[in-house]
């Protein structure tokens, strides 16, 4: 009895710990979660656009201040060796709010109040000793090799305050010998609508500055991005994804989880020389497609979502696999990498051909598009014939 009672207490204590972990984030809508800060915590999330993916490692320290590291991944900036993992990565570490001046004094004494996620990260903080509230908005560009941040300061006092916002550009240059296209340039550009960045804010008035993290190849023109236009484009993308194929169950957790999964699956499509390529990400897998992840799993999902960029990525990936069909019925590669110019396979077939054939057939049925089906039919037939040739004596496909 004592043993069972002890085990029961351990189980209840574990459940309590798990419950505490779960309730750090609160669902505020079917598409949004919020962390109301009440202690130290660190977390991470990846967000992507057609030309960029960024992993944010963020949190709140013991002083209540915001801490962040941004690992920007540029899938089309290929590095040497140009393999599965050959996407340029660069860390931009630290926050920029401390560069602001309020009445000539540094902006210090931050207390982060909330962190919200809905495809965009929003961080709200107060600086009680300075009479300032700050809202940070973080998100990827939908179309450019850039990640965007907006810092908006509000005067929360009943008297005017002078706010000075930073303006500068930091540049980093990669080793020419390690880039497929030579040296790449990475920049962090801070700017505000007013050239000198100085504002006299009355009670309740706001001022903002933007930070654009961008990548450039040789001879690329400098991007002139406006954070508000980029934010509008991101919101349009999210509205489309969140508004289609809405899951409604008795569980708010499952509904919200599905909403976030739709965003992640759709945003991680990269515009490459090999076409639109949906990739797993995770600081490892970009500008490449796999027989399982893409052909079998997510490609048949996109017609249900009604996302045209997703359908395009599906057709592009099937087209890449079609290039490897052969009269000898040798296996297809497991993955097609480096923007489609190379491939990776295991010794023999791990079921990749069956995956591709299944996914192509499911996609054709789901899309209901005769033109697409006609393009996919040779691939489907080839995969079926391959599998037929792999039947063993018991009628099971060998792989």
PLM regions and their residue ranges:
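Bacterial Sec-dependent N-terminal signal peptides
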Residues: 1-21
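A generic secondary-structure signal for well-formed alpha-helical elements
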Residues: 155-157, 213-219, 305-309, 321, ...
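Terminal accessory carbohydrate-recognition/targeting modules of carbohydrate-active enzymes
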Residues: 17-256, 306-307
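The feature captures the catalytic groove of carbohydrate-active enzymes
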Residues: 200-227, 283-287, 333-355, 385-399
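Substrate-binding groove/exosite segments of carbohydrate-active enzymes
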Residues: 239-374
């Amino acid at each position: 009895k004592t043993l069972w009672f002890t085990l029961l207490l351990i189980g209840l204590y574990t459940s309590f710990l798990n419950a505490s972990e779960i309730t750090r984030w609160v669902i505020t809508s079917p598409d949004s979660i919020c962390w109301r800060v009440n202690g130290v915590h660190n977390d991470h999330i990846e967000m992507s656009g057609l030309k960029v993916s960024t992993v944010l490692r963020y949190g709140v320290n013991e002083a209540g201040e915001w801490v962040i590291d941004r690992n920007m991944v540029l899938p089309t900036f290929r590095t040497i060796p140009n393999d599965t993992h050959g996407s340029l990565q660069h860390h931009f570490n630290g926050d920029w709010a401390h560069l602001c001046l309020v009445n000539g004094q540094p902006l210090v004494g931050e207390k982060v109040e909330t962190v919200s996620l809905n495809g965009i990260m929003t961080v709200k903080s107060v600086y009680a000793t300075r009479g300032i509230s700050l809202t940070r908005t973080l998100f990827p560009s939908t179309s450019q090799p850039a990640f965007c941040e907006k810092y908006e300061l509000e005067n929360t006092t009943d008297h005017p305050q002078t706010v000075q916002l930073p303006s500068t550009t930091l540049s980093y240059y990669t080793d020419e010998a390690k880039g497929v296209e030579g040296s790449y340039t990475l920049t962090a550009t801070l700017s505000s609508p007013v050239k000198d960045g100085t504002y006299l804010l009355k009670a309740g008035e706001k001022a903002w500055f933007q930070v654009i993290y961008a990548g450039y190849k040789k001879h690329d023109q400098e991007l002139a991005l406006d954070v508000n236009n980029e934010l509008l484009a991101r919101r349009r993308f999210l509205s489309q994804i969140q508004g289609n194929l809405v899951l409604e169950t008795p569980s708010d957790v499952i509904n919200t989880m599905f909403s976030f999964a739709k965003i992640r699956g759709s945003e991680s499509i990269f515009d490459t020389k090999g076409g639109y390529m949906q990739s797993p990400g995770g600081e490892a897998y970009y500008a490449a497609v796999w027989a399982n992840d893409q052909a079998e799993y997510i490609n048949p999902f996109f017609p249900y979502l009604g996302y045209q960029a997703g359908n395009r990525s599906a057709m592009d990936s099937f087209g890449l696999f079609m290039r490897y069909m052969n009269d000898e019925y040798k296996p297809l590669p497991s993955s097609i990498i480096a923007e489609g110019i190379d491939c990776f396979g295991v010794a023999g077939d791990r079921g990749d051909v069956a995956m591709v054939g299944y996914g192509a057939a499911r996609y054709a049925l789901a899309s209901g598009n005769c033109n697409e089906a006609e393009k996919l039919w040779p691939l489907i037939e080839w995969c079926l014939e391959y599998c037929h040739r792999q039947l063993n004596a018991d009628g099971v496909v060998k792989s």
